[in-house]
Amino acid sequence: MRLSNGLGWVLNEMRRLEDKPCLAYNLNMTIHILKGKATVLQMQEMLVSFPDMRMVKIVVDIENEILAGGSGMHYECEQLLLEDGSKQENLWGANWFPDEQSVEFESLINIRPRQNKSIIIQDENICNEVERITRKFLGDIKP
């Protein structure tokens, strides 16, 4: 039976896919907090969440130069950094594509009433800092 509302559709899809592996979001993920260059093993573990896309969701603390990555959701990395002592206004979400060595500055955690009104980081200086720190910790690592 298909329910008419959006939630019903989600529940039906969950039942239908119950025994099938999910390729888009792997629950066996490992989130790493990096304060220095990542190892090849760390990069491989961070890629587990999105193996088909070869992408790592990251959150960068631009004040303390710390990076968390490897979750299926940016907010999980954000929460770990907040628990580690980071301040919300210094945390920015992005995606790292190791094969292309490129950064995409897009995440829901980037929406802030006073700092940024979009999921894409609008301030060029913040983008530059996120990219610099990301390349410092993840650049040139071939998993």
Outline where the language-model segments fall.
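Short, positively charged and aromatic/hydrophobic N-terminal segments
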Residues: Y25-N26
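Negatively charged, low-complexity tracts enriched in Asp/Glu with abundant Ser/Thr
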Residues: K35-L80
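Amphipathic, interaction-prone secondary-structure segments
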Residues: G70-S102
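Intrinsically disordered, low-complexity regulatory segments enriched in Ser/Thr/Pro
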Residues: P98-I121
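Well-ordered alpha/beta subsegment
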Residues: E124-P143
